[in-house]
């Protein structure tokens, strides 16, 4: 399984509120792209402004969390994925994502990459 991962930092001039508003629109476009390419799962998440995140960062000396993370799960290979992205429907969504990124993403401090999923586990909570 292939995952297209986007770890996004917001442009410095955007407030968290402005980023979140634009992130929803960006996420909708990622979901639409996922539908076009036959993805079997799409995840779009935004980091939380909570004390725990700051505490972990200070304790560990780590970088700030990404503002948003988008993952598109695809059952084919990397060459198949890139071939599908060239088709008119998916290409239109990619073009819109690139346009949205101009006003949203601090590209030099973000990252975009393909990954394989090596371990997966699902748990269900016992009923109350």
Task: Give the label of every model feature segment.
Residues 1-128:
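Macromolecular interaction modules
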